[in-house]
Amino acid sequence: MALYAQTAGTLSNNSGTFTPMQGLSLTIPEGVGTTAIITLNVPNPYATGNDIPGGMFGVTVNGKVSPVVASFTYNDTPSSFGRVPTTLVVGIPLGNTAQTIQAVWAGVRGSTVIIDSPASLSAVF
């Protein structure tokens, strides 16, 4: 079985802590002994800022942030902000009850992270 969610429109985030990515939430079913493979695909993000900008991406499971995260930063403060495709893949064991998976993101070093093309969250189990 597979589940899928996708963003629409332009989204931005300037928080230094993880906040939910609008539209990227799934509820995976119960199923002890099975692992769901969760993929967060952010194909064209970029970050703006004055101190080597970048972004971090992760997922929460029932509100708790997974320790597995993906991130990008530029090598220095760029004169123009290029796209940095970022993908996170994490295994989440199914439990005795359904679990909510929410994509989260944050800027690093005071930067603003922007996506203006669809990002997706999927689960296969």
Where are these regions (language model features)?
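Extracellular receptor-binding modules and their adjoining Ser/Thr/Gly/Asp/Asn-rich linkers
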Residues: 1-3
